[in-house]
From Swiss-Prot:
Protein name in the entry: Myc target protein 1
Residue numbers carrying Phosphoserine: 135, 138, 141, 149
Keywords: Nucleus, Phosphoprotein
Annotated motif Bipartite nuclear localization signal, positions: 95-113
Gene designation per UniProt: MYCT1
Amino acid sequence: MRTQVYEGLCKNYFSLAVLQRDRIKLLFFDILVFLSVFLLFLLFLVDIMANNTTSLGSPWPENFWEDLIMSFTVSMAIGLVLGGFIWAVFICLSRRRRASAPISQWSSSRRSRSSYTHGLNRTGFYRHSGCERRSNLSLASLTFQRQASLEQANSFPRKSSFRASTFHPFLQCPPLPVETESQLVTLPSSNISPTISTSHSLSRPDYWSSNSLRVGLSTPPPPAYESIIKAFPDS
């Protein structure tokens, strides 16, 4: 789109320049014709004054009007011939310039366009690099804050839980019956839910929450090893 606009502007500029050149040529041609006629007329008057054969009865010399008409026609003819010759020379020069102008104009327009697009690309590169630098700085600050928060959280003494350190795919299982000497006792499920929530909270820490709430939660110890053995008796 920009290239089309630039081409249209260049065409309009060159068309206006050609019209202005034509007007200047016409004005120059008219000036040359007028000067040639005026100079020839002055030469004729000087000739008449040099060969002055006036008589006392008439203020004008003999055959004055005939000589004036003749000089005017001759001066006009000479002026037209000179003007036509000069016009033909100017047309030939303008055609040669037009034949050689598009290459230089096209190359100059291409150079200016390439320099302009190169400048735009460089400005875009600087903008993108500035954005990337800002994003990198923001990411670095976020990671630094996260590391600092993790270090603060780890600085407090905390018990390491068995369920948080190992992977348990079957956590949400129904309570298991335990055989005792007199009756069957089911393991309470209240100990499982906080361990699940705490394990999830430890596996996915919320960086945007306050550190005091996360540190204050303490995980209960796992069930006794003997109860697990009794829950799965040997068959």
